[in-house]
Amino acid sequence: MAREKIRIKKIDNITARQVTFSKRRRGIFKKADELSVLCDADVALIIFSATGKLFEFSSSRMRDILGRYSLHASNINKLMDPPSTHLRLENCNLSRLSKEVEDKTKQLRKLRGEDLDGLNLEELQRLEKLLESGLSRVSEKKGECVMSQIFSLEKRGSELVDENKRLRDKLETLERAKLTTLKEALETESVTTNVSSYDSGTPLEDDSDTSLKLGLPSWE
């Protein structure tokens, strides 16, 4: 047989009400203590009786638990508060930037030749002019780059010509110095050779007029 569901309502009899309050209070405190031990939870209960008497239970220091509750409630209230003027302005700027990014992305896709099906003749002509203008700027920039490279190459070529001339002049100077040294060496060697030949091959001159003549004297 099913148990009849007890209807919960205020107990009119004051004595019965106080007895029930005492029993239920002890029961709920016991359940809170079990919850704290079994689940390693911080539990705090505050009960005021009908006469205004305070009853409390806490698994740790009541002040610490209430402090955590106050901090948590404060954070929730901040989240529930309407956004500040600064935050609304930031959201507005974010929406504007997102719209600009979306528009630029669409424009870029069209410049690539994509998503052109929905464009009318006027929009296509405007896109064509935009492409022509962009192509003109690209060509102009390309010309500037080419001229810059030509200038750099010409400058490098001039530097190489100057360097080549400097090396050639240096080489000619070295060759002239080498020839001068060789010529001086040959001249010195020639003088030495002539002196040696003179000392060994030239006979001494005889200053004496004495001579031996045989035969009859000639009569003129």
UniProtKB/Swiss-Prot annotation:
One of its GO terms (molecular function) is sequence-specific DNA binding. This is MADS-box protein AGL24. Residues 1-61 form the MADS-box domain. Signal peptide: none annotated. InterPro entries: MADS-box/MEF2_TF, MEF2-like_N, TF_Kbox, TF_MADSbox, TF_MADSbox_sf. Residues 190-220 are annotated as: Disordered. The keyword Transcription regulation applies. Keywords: Activator, Cytoplasm, Developmental protein, Differentiation, DNA-binding, Flowering, Nucleus, Phosphoprotein, Transcription, Transcription regulation. Induction: Induced by vernalization in a FLC-independent manner. Repressed by the floral homeotic genes AP1, LFY and SEP3 in emerging floral meristems to establish a floral identity and prevent inflorescence fate. Up-regulated at the shoot apex by SOC1. It comes from the Eukaryota. Mostly expressed in shoot apical meristems, including floral meristems. Also detected in stems, seedlings, leaves, flowers and siliques, and, to a lower extent, in roots. Disruption phenotype: Delayed flowering. One of its GO terms (biological process) is maintenance of inflorescence meristem identity. Phosphorylated by IMK3. Induced by vernalization. GO terms for cellular component: cytoplasm; nucleus. Residues 190-200 have a biased composition (Polar residues). Residues 87-177 form the K-box domain. Interacts with IMK3/MRLK. Forms a homodimer and heterodimer with SOC1, AP1 and SVP through MADS-box domain. Interacts with the SEU-LUG corepressor complex when complexed to AP1. Interacts with AGL15 and AGL16. Transcription activator that mediates floral transition in response to vernalization. Promotes inflorescence fate in apical meristems. Acts in a dosage-dependent manner. Probably involved in the transduction of RLK-mediated signaling (e.g. IMK3 pathway). Together with AP1 and SVP, controls the identity of the floral meristem and regulates expression of class B, C and E genes. When associated with SOC1, mediates effect of gibberellins on flowering under short-day conditions, and regulates the expression of LEAFY (LFY), which links floral induction and floral development. Pfam families: K-box, SRF-TF. It is found in: Nucleus; Cytoplasm.
